Amino acid sequence: MMPCFVMLFGICCLAGCEGSKHHLKKVRLNEVAHSIFYAPQYVAIEKGYFEKEGIELELTTGFGADKTATAIISGDADIAFMGPEATIYQFNQGNADYLINFAQLTQRAGNFVVSRNKEDFQWENLKGKKVIGGRPGGMPEMVFEYVLKKHGMNPQKDIDLVQNIDFANTSGAFVSGKADYT
């Protein structure tokens, strides 16, 4: 009878500990952008799946791979969602302590072309128009220029490419009328 009591008491004690905030491992995640591509993560946060796995997830948005990489290097984040460009730049500069990319999160780039006007979009519509691009050398900008070239356009000649707006301010700049597309 005593072994059953001890076992029952132990189970009750363990059950009382489940879900306790005191035992959660804090993980600081810095995402490059708040994106529809990370929707499964946002659902998991809202549904409490991380807590059920013993993780207290602290989510911040870096608004650019350069800032997200800086958060990792400075110790302000434990893990990051971003493209590989920051790692490549660090490695090419000869940094001994460069970042390591270890997983592919999405199958494709998260680029969208947004127009000021409702139209049946064709890539040729961009010719001669002002377009807010990304940071030179950043993954979104490199992908955008690649796609333009695949559609027979020269990004430096065929469009008026704006690349001097900080990532966090691009949507505000577009809404305020700074470009025809973003």
Language-model regions, residue ranges each:
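C-terminal motif of bacterial Sec signal peptides marking the signal peptidase cleavage site
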Residues: 12-16
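Short, glycine-/small- and polar/acidic-enriched structural segments
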Residues: 22-176, 180-181
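Short, conserved catalytic or interaction motifs in soluble domains
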Residues: 19
